[in-house]
Structures are given as C-alpha cells and as structure tokens.
C-alpha cells in the first residue's frame, strides 16, 4: 500500500530550511487553501539530475509574478534548493515539487499582506500512466470542461486553481474506464491532458500547443 503523502519519511525544504516530512504543515485558514493562491512546478529527476531545471524555475517565478506573488528566493537559491533536496532524501529517480502559496495572515479576496511561503518536496514517482496502458496506447476521453480564455485568468501560469477542471475531467474519465481526459481550449483546439503535455512529431519537428491555450 502506498503511504499517504502526509505520512512519509524524508525531508521537505520549507521556507528556507529542512524539516521532517511530517512537520511540513500549514494553517487551515491559509489563503491558498480557500482561494487557490498558489503556484507550483513538477520536475522529473533522472539519475539524480533534474530535467530542465532552469526552465522550470523560470516558469515558477513567471507564474508567481503573473499571480501577483513575489517568491522570497532568487532563481539561483531555488535551483540550489531543488538540487540539494535530491541528495538530502537520497533519491535517484523521482519527482520534485516546488510550490509557493499565500499564508493565513489575511482572509478574504484581497491578500496583499499575506506572507508568500515556499516549499520543495521530492519523492519517488513512476510514470504518470500505467506501463501496460502505455504499451497498448493511452485511451483518452474528450473532456466536457474546457481550458479558460486567457482573458479570464492568466492561463499561461502553473497555478493551482487552474487544475480544478483537470481534476473533474480526470475523475469523470476514470469512472468511464479511460486513462485520462483530453482537454480542449476555449476555442475547441487541443490543449493538453489533465496532467501531461501533448505533442506530435511531423517532419522531424516537435509540435505542441501554445501556453495560453
């Protein structure tokens, strides 16, 4: 049985220092829990190295800026922390999750005085899809929920609030026997899966949807 994510061994980088996994907690009245005010990244680790770490950190800082948040650490500090947590937890192949969120200093839509917290966790996480399903080909349902227009929210960010439609779509697809759901954008164009990018190769070139779809 897989251990719950709140009950594991290891360390989490939490606001500038390492804490035991079980001690990395936040208050129930944190703004992020009520209003979705958090941004994050998902970074794969192969043989103790993070794939495209620079690009991930740049996108994280961009997402935070677009969501009116200032992460209190520099790009280099974040990169160093992401690299160090691999060795701190003795992970060879895994997944790194940096996340920034608004704290509990204010409750309400306005949150300009909230503290921006920052944490980095790492764990061993195999392929997003079952290996047998990958060999057969992933079965996707077309979701009835669409990615929002860029005029409604900064949808070129990796913001937590944007993932609610992905959760709804994934649940619905799984209940129908599909592995995942294909998300379309507000114009009906192919966007992504619920938690994975979609691309195809044509004439030796990689084609993938634009970030604002």
Regions found by a protein language model. Give the residues of each.
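Helix-start/capping segments and mature chain N-termini
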Residues: 1-73, 77-84, 109-213
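Short, acidic/charged, Gly/Pro-enriched secondary-structure junctions
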Residues: 79-93, 97-106, 123
